[in-house]
Structures are given as C-alpha cells and as structure tokens.
Amino acid sequence: MARQKFSGKGGKGKSKKGQQSTAPRRRVEFKYKGFTLPELQEMPIKKFIEIVPARQRRTMSRGITPNQRKLVMKIKKARRLVNRGKEPRVIRTHCRDFVITPEMIGLTISIYTGKQFKEIKLVEETLGRFLGEMAPTRGIVQHGSPGMGATRGSMFVPIK
C-alpha cells in the first residue's frame, strides 16, 4: 500500500495556494439551542425563557422595569411597521440589561454607552444576549508618544 506524502502545511495536501473551490458556499441555517428562527418567533416568551442561559433566564423571570416596558412598546410599534412594509425608525434606549428576544431580530437599536448612542443591527447571532454586550462602554486607549518632561530619558531628546 502506498503511503501519502505529508506536506506539513495541514489540510489534505491537494489544494494549491490561490485556488478556490468552484462550488457555491451554502449558508448554514441558523439555529439557537436546536430551534430555527421562525420557530423561535412563534414560540411564547415563557418557553423562550426556558432555553436561554441561566443569567438571562434569571433576569427575564424577575419581570421588567418601567424603562424596559417602554422599550418593549417601541419594539412592538417598530415590528408593526415592518409587517406593513415600512422602514421603522432607529430605537434609542438606555436599557443595557434587556435580553434580546426573537421578535427583536432585524431591528436597529441605538444603545447608550454612557457617552453616546451606538447603533446596532440585531441579527440572529445576538439572540439571548444582553443589549449592553453589543455596545461596550470602554474603548481601547491608544496613547501617543510621550512629551517633553514625561520621562527622565526625554531630557536628551531634541525639541522639534
């Protein structure tokens, strides 16, 4: 029996660099905990609460605050506009502790970060997460070069 040569680069060893397969890429159907999106959208909220992770389940089972209730009303209004074929306005909210439910998928929501509103398009992959996870409150700090007098070594750096 002939042994296969090992190319050392991983994979099957047949494809060459720069070549792509001719078969069209298929989009895998989205499933959340074994349920498709249409099944999730028809599902009652009580059943959806049972399949989300424990942290979200605890939050949702405790009820909603008045601010969250306002957000739910805005979501229902936007969903009615979508069903009529109109484009809804972006929903602005300060509620970062609200769990993304199946009825919210497809909407655009602006979430307050403490300084500004960050616009987020809710897709299937965001399902069951908190709104606050989608809009980080802290950014990555990129410091510039140190100025004169910042360190002892900068004494010998010529001034521009």
Swiss-Prot record:
Query: Which one of the record's GO molecular function terms can you name?
Result: rRNA binding
Task: Please name the Gene3D superfamilies in this protein's record.
Answer: 30s Ribosomal Protein S19, Chain A (3.30.860.10)
Where on the tree of life does the source sit, at the highest rank?
Archaea
Q: Which InterPro entries match?
A: Ribosomal_uS19 (IPR002222), Ribosomal_uS19_CS (IPR020934), Ribosomal_uS19_euk/arc (IPR005713), Ribosomal_uS19_SF (IPR023575)
Q: Which UniProt keywords apply?
A: Ribonucleoprotein, Ribosomal protein, RNA-binding, rRNA-binding
Task: Report one GO cellular component.
Answer: cytosolic small ribosomal subunit
List the Pfam families: Ribosomal_S19 (PF00203)
Respond yes or no to whether keyword RNA-binding is given for this record.
Answer: yes
Please give the biological process terms from Gene Ontology that the record holds. ribosomal small subunit assembly; translation
Identify the stretch(es) annotated as Disordered. Answer: 1-27
**What family does the Swiss-Prot or TrEMBL record give for this protein?**
Belongs to the universal ribosomal protein uS19 family.
* Job of this protein: Protein S19 forms a complex with S13 that binds strongly to the 16S ribosomal RNA.
Show the HAMAP family listed in the entry: Ribosomal_uS19
Its recorded name reads: Small ribosomal subunit protein uS19
